């Protein structure tokens, strides 16, 4: 009798240990995704276009009615030969809490995205997604395919920090409030581009866009590539666009569309910084107002093929023939000549544009009679 009781207790304990070893997500409603068996790493793609009700899993939850995907410590390490590792329908809001990671792990030829928004099922990345919250998303594509990308679709970043490895391919990009996008191209990225935008870019509030391109055989590859003929760049308030010194692409910010006049960049606040191996900024027209400022430098030219609109009574434009000159050392008088800036006939390799804050006395129309005592 005692032996039977011991065997019964052993069986109960064994069953309890088996249940404990099963990941909690295995019991989550609607969860049908593979884990690595030792942690809460999800190893299969998630397609939220297929969801028909609220669902949740390890580090994520989906509100079907509002199309809201909340990420809270999710870790997805998956390969896919379809749309992307995580696909969301048009109009989805993604809320970031904590630290989140999504990786496309296939290192072979894989023409995929890490995270994309889709409207038409047959067309990738034609949808819009809004990202908010105060967390972090690390999105990485490890594919060696030149068409492999990190993010896709029209992106509105209202908050949180997104660190994207692999080209961000977007129809339009908006960064507001405290949103931060750090984009890094890989050696496999098409033409070494970090951010490829077919529409416009808007950065305001305290929003920040940083893009680092890779060296490439393309004649004028860039960290930020813009291709639309009808859109513009807009930087206002405390927003910033930065292509830092580590950029290895030939151009920092480049418009490649067929509009011969280039693309306008309206900078009324914040700062634009652009380093490029050849040009800092190319075929982008700087329209300066308010408190906006620019630092741009290139191995050959600071700015090329530009039609600027800058009131020199309100802004100071200085230059240097030195590549990567420190901003405080850029003091030379520049002259605009056919789309380029020069200093004494030599090409300006660094140009700084900023509001004129020097003391000035401005006299308006005077009326009345001025008298002195005898």
Enumerate the language-model features and the residues they cover.
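A composition-driven surface/loop motif
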Residues: 8-11, 18, 27-374
